[in-house]
Structures are given as C-alpha cells and as structure tokens.
Amino acid sequence: MSSAIETKKVVVEEIASKLKESKSTIIVDYRGLNVSEVTELRKQLREANVEFKVYKNTMTRRAVEQAELNGLNDFLTGPNAIAFSTEDVVAPAKVLNDFAKNHEALEIKAGVIEGKVSTVEEVKALAELPSREGLLSMLLSVLQAPVRNLALAAKAVAEQKEEQGA
C-alpha cells in the first residue's frame, strides 16, 4: 500500500513540475482517435519537441493544486492527454490545432500559456500565430525596409546625377 502511494506522489510531483516549467501546456480529449491516429499525433508532437502524456485525472488535479492553476480543474473530466512544451509557446497549440482540424475526435479543452490558464479560444488564437522564427523574420524585414528604401533612393539619385553629367 505504501509503495503505491509513494508512486502516486512521484507522478503528482512530476506533473506539477512539468506544469510549472513548461512555457505552454495544452489539455485535450482524445476520445475517438484510433491507435494509428494517436501514434501520428505523438510523432508530430515529438518532432516539435512537445511531450504528450496521459495521466489519471485525480493525480492531475492534485498536481494542478500544487502548481496553483486551479482554473484547470473544471476541464479535467473524461479521458485527457496533456501536451507540455518547455521550449516553444506556440508549438503544442499549433500541432494540436492542425491535427484537430483533420480529426474531429480530438478536442482541445484548455491550456496554460506562460503560467496563465487559457481558454480554448485563446489556445486556438495562439495556434494561428506564426512561430518565433517567423515573427523574427517579419520584424527583421520591417526593420530593413527603411534602410533598403534609403539605399534605393541614393542609388536612383546617383544614377540621375550620372545621366545629367554625361
């Protein structure tokens, strides 16, 4: 009996630490997915460096209380799987949202984004954002535009002066 309780405590600690450490956590209902679909989902999440696990709701509830994310308890009914990402905030939301579009059986329930409990709508809005690299490239192109325009204007003036001088 004691070893079972100790094992459960370890699992609760594991879930709580993942909830605290992850930048983004998404809770999904995977009922209705067959084995090959779940395997494909796990593969896509693994490629995005996202951990995907199924835990008992009672242990998850205790971990949620430890992590002080009590707003999640309302979503912990039925079979749930949890996707954790410690690197990218957008990755789990994007992969799960894209997968849910193709497989109606997968339902996004809620999430934790940078320590804040988020609704399904917020998770889906996050999924529509470009990745960090995409946002950085957009920012870089916006920052380069004035310099590029100045260089083109200077080149045009130089060519015009050259034509007038010739």
Curated annotation (Swiss-Prot):
Keywords: Ribonucleoprotein, Ribosomal protein, RNA-binding, rRNA-binding, Stress response. The keyword RNA-binding applies. GO terms for biological process: translation. GO terms for cellular component: cytosolic large ribosomal subunit. GO terms for molecular function: large ribosomal subunit rRNA binding; structural constituent of ribosome. Pfam families: Ribosomal_L10. Induction: In response to low temperature and salt stress. SUPFAM superfamilies: Ribosomal protein L10-like (SSF160369). NCBIfam families: PRK00099.1-1. Belongs to the universal ribosomal protein uL10 family. Forms part of the ribosomal stalk, playing a central role in the interaction of the ribosome with GTP-bound translation factors (such as IF-2, EF-Tu, EF-G and RF3). Part of the ribosomal stalk of the 50S ribosomal subunit. The N-terminus interacts with L11 and 23S rRNA to form the base of the stalk. The C-terminus forms an elongated spine to which L12 dimers bind in a sequential fashion forming a pentameric L10(L12)2(L12)2 complex. HAMAP family: Ribosomal_uL10. This is Large ribosomal subunit protein uL10.
